[in-house]
């Protein structure tokens, strides 16, 4: 799977984990050069508190377009720190 935004591959892996129709990419497969920490957080009752990244490519910024769970519930430990995408980021084979 690949996550693409603004013509750049943000993440690529054959080992994503699918949760609620979202592909979560292992952290080591994400090109962190395109990511900047956001101060945005959301809470999922069964996964835990999500932290977000802004994606920046060629001067364009997609705010809070990637998220991950740095601390998870027991049910979500399998994808702790894995990164998922939305807001126009194309995830495809």
PLM feature spans:
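Terminal leader/tail segments of proteins
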Residues: 1-93
């Amino acid at each position: 799977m690949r996550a693409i935004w603004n013509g750049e591959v943000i993440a690529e892996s054959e080992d994503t984990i699918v949760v609620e129709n979202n592909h979560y990419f292992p952290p080591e497969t994400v090109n962190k050069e395109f990511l900047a920490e956001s101060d945005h957080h959301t809470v999922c009752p069964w996964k835990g508190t999500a932290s977000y990244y802004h994606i920046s490519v060629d001067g364009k910024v997609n705010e809070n377009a990637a998220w991950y769970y740095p601390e998870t519930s027991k049910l979500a430990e399998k994808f702790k720190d894995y990164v998922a995408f939305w807001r126009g980021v194309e995830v495809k084979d």
